[in-house]
């Protein structure tokens, strides 16, 4: 009986392995904050390849994006242990620096680098051992921050996250979707926080999944001070304080102001100008140390990151005479109001006012026909303003949108004629299109 059960268990383990292209033996991520403010990120993993597809499509290369201006990359190990036990180290020409795809076409960010590591000696049954350090100087936000989502394309047998800070330094952290507290120890003047997740299942390969932080184990941590102080540090840079615009930008705004268009149409024209005439650079803020360019620099370069285009949009709207506030969106369940991790920001918007009509939210990176506020349900918005004397935040709650039609109609064989009054409440309507063109109401009525 014992032999029979052992055979079943063995077959089950083999079947479970073959359900995936590979399996991580372990993944360890370690963050170390030194007393001088520098941060060392140490990554180490061991990956067993189970299919040809594993190394032909998915795991044949590793990619590390970094910024040479304040970061130094050191690869400690890139080795393959073949199925017969032979060890093959990656040769010198297996390490190649390229420009990250998201920095393509940008002069301002063409110093960014992506290290492409080509693993060699790959075959079914081989194991890739990979280990590197990424050391960051104290530039930008003057504290440690990190964000880890326990989401992997294949299973992980052992996953561990370690954070080390000098004794006396407070590490703020929040764990979501999993009840797991860190093991806290001290050694050599450092406080060591260890989250041992053990075995982690592969993420489901399905479409229409919710945001990862809403159901995967999610860890966010930071040595930041209070939320207010963090926002002060965030906005203490010329990008937020030097809002001067080039003459070419001022001329474009004056041209829009002189038109006979309504205020709503002028606002949308300015928004579309930023969206359509400036390229969108999907560069993570952490990669540029949360240091952004001024509106003038962004305008003249014809490109910008999400936050840079948002800052520019706010500056252009103010130039046109409209109120404009920059806000950052953070998932409410992630935000802890006692401290702040800028990595938790998921989007930036401009809040402006259509005179005598409504307060609206605009994106600087994609067009939308309605007020974005309903889309922000489940998020808390933070005012990003260097002149703010205290933190300003507000949570977005769900809001019903309704359409009420009252009138008299003459129903004929192939048409309906009559007069009616339409009342649309809430914000989930093609708000901007209605203000620009009354006939947009006909399209709404057609769908009722």
Each predicted region: which residue ranges?
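Secretory-pathway-linked proteins and extracytosolic
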Residues: 135-288, 323, 412, 418-436
